Structures are given as C-alpha cells and as structure tokens.
Curated annotation (Swiss-Prot):
Catalytically driven reaction(s): a quinone + NADH + 5 H(+)(in) = a quinol + NAD(+) + 4 H(+)(out)
Record family assignment: Belongs to the complex I 20 kDa subunit family.
PANTHER family per the UniProt record, alphabetical: NADH DEHYDROGENASE, NADH DEHYDROGENASE [UBIQUINONE] IRON-SULFUR PROTEIN 7, MITOCHONDRIAL
SUPFAM superfamilies, per the entry: HydA/Nqo6-like
Name used for this protein in its record: NADH-quinone oxidoreductase subunit B
Residue pairs linked by disulfide bridges in the UniProt entry: none
Cofactor binding, per record: Binds 1 [4Fe-4S] cluster.
Organism the protein comes from: Rhodococcus opacus (strain B4)
Cellular localisation: Cell membrane
Topological category with respect to the lipid bilayer: Peripheral membrane protein
EC code: 7.1.1.-
Functional summary from the UniProt entry: NDH-1 shuttles electrons from NADH, via FMN and iron-sulfur (Fe-S) centers, to quinones in the respiratory chain. The immediate electron acceptor for the enzyme in this species is believed to be a menaquinone. Couples the redox reaction to proton translocation (for every two electrons transferred, four hydrogen ions are translocated across the cytoplasmic membrane), and thus conserves the redox energy in a proton gradient.
C-alpha cells in the first residue's frame, strides 16, 4: 500500500523515516473517549483560547476507523472496558493512546471493584497525563511529548515489531486486585 510495503526490510533512509514521522505527527486524528470531568477540559482544549488545531487536530473523530489517537479522559468502569478495547481494535495503524487524568491512569480515588485501576490493563498507553482534571495546557504538553515519540517511530516491519513489543510490555502489568496491602 505505502512506501513501507514497497521497500525491503531495513532499506529505509533516515531522511524518509524523518519525513514520514514529521508528516504523521502533524496529522493526528483524535477519537475522544470522554467519561468524566476530564472530558470537559479536553473540550476546552479544542476552543479558541488553547487552539488544538495548531497541531493538526481540529476535528475529533466520532468513528474509531478514522482516528489514530485515543484520548481516554476519565474513569473506566468494568462494563465499559470491553467497549474501550473494541474501539482500540477498530482504530487504524499506527495508533496511540493518551490516558488523561488520574482516573484513567490509575483509577483515581475510585479504588473499588467497579472501576478499572488504570486503562493500561485494557489498552497499551503511550502517554500518561496526571491531574484531576488536568488543565488544557497539560494536555497540549502531553500531545507535544507524543509528537516527539511519533517522530522517532520507524517505518515498515520494524514499526510493527516496536508496536507489538510495546503492547506486550504495557499489558504485562500486575492487576491491582493481586497487589496486597495497596491502601494500608
């Protein structure tokens, strides 16, 4: 389909990878997965004061098939976890996940059976954004950090290897139910 399929493995010039990373980072299409108060701050980021359109993200996509960045904003319940994974699986490659807020990152103050203690138990997370709720400036900083990470991503079969290894490492976390004495 693209240049990464046409060229043999290992035969990519650094400038081509750099150019592809530059283009890719400037055209992220986010899918918002707003579940709590963090979603309000995410919507404020799209407003005129903070202007997320400067980074090529002016339209939040309603369909995961059109998005390559998922911003999980807020707490995820156990019933919502399969839906989150299904949306992640429907996104186009390459795809990235940003966990926005303490609830998405670690469950927040909701340490009970109904809330997933961090979305990294469901999908691999690329950037963790702390705060309750994080301000739009922090979200923009996290997006710029993600831009730097995207710029360094390789092309071709190497990209698939890196993505597969990152997903395996991210989902290898110990479930919090197995962590004894967490709040004692």
């Amino acid at each position: 389909m693209g240049i990464e399929e046409k060229l043999p493995s290992g035969f990519l010039l650094t400038t081509v990878e750099g150019l592809a990373g530059y283009v890719r980072k400037g055209s992220l299409w986010p899918a918002s997965f707003g579940l709590a108060c963090c979603a309000i701050e995410m919507m404020a980021t799209a407003g005129g004061r903070f202007d997320i359109a400067r980074f090529g993200m002016e339209a939040f996509r309603a369909s995961p098939r059109q998005a390559d960045l998922m911003i999980v904003a807020g707490r995820v319940s156990q019933k919502m976890a399969p839906v989150l994974r299904q949306i992640y699986d429907q996104m186009v490659e390459p795809k990235w996940v940003l966990a926005m807020g303490v609830c998405a990152s670690s469950g927040g103050m909701f340490n009970n059976y109904a809330i997933v203690q961090g979305v990294d138990h469901i999908v691999p997370v690329d950037i963790y954004l702390p705060g309750c709720p994080p301000r739009p400036e922090m979200l923009l900083n996290a997006i710029l950090t993600l831009h730097e990470k995207i710029q360094q991503m390789p092309l071709g079969v190497h990209r698939d290897e890196v993505a597969r290894a990152a997903e395996q490492a991210a989902l290898a976390a110990t479930p919090t139910i197995q962590m004894k004495g967490l709040l004692r």
